[in-house]
Amino acid sequence: MYAVTFDLDTNCLNENAVNLSKVYSDIRKFMEQHGFKWQQGSVYFGDETINAVTCVATVQILAKQIPSFAVCVKDVRMLKIEENNDLMPAIKIVL
């Protein structure tokens, strides 16, 4: 499974008069339309159709379609996830 994670510079967004809520909403909508599911924050997990090439291509298209992403992104990474383990049961054990 592949994932994309990124960090947007909120100062840059503000300086460019970009509405924070709208840009994050637009990014989420775009990612969901391209085979990714929002996980948390700025982390999106790809579905079974996503491989390394489609992951990179998706980020490139995102940068073209949402220019504020390209201008204000501080860090963007593609991750390959070998396992996706939910640790919530471990937290509940100690409560």
UniProtKB/Swiss-Prot annotation:
What domain of life does the UniProt record list for this protein's source?
Bacteria
Q: Which UniProt keywords apply?
A: Hydrolase, Nuclease, Virulence
For whether the record's keyword set contains Nuclease, the answer is yes
> Signal sequence span per UniProt?
none
Entry EC no(s): 3.1.-.-
> Could you cite one Gene Ontology molecular function of this protein?
RNA binding
Q: Which InterPro entries match?
A: VapD, Virulence_VapD/CRISPR_Cas2
**Enzyme class, first EC level, given as a word:** hydrolase
Free-text function comment from the UniProt entry: Cleaves ssRNA, mostly between U:A.
**What additional remark is attached to this entry?**
There is no ortholog for HP0967 in strain J99.
Q: How does it assemble?
A: Homodimer.
Membership in a protein family: Belongs to the VapD ribonuclease family.
Supply the name of the protein: Endoribonuclease VapD homolog
Q: What is the organism of origin for this protein?
A: Helicobacter pylori (strain ATCC 700392 / 26695) (Campylobacter pylori)
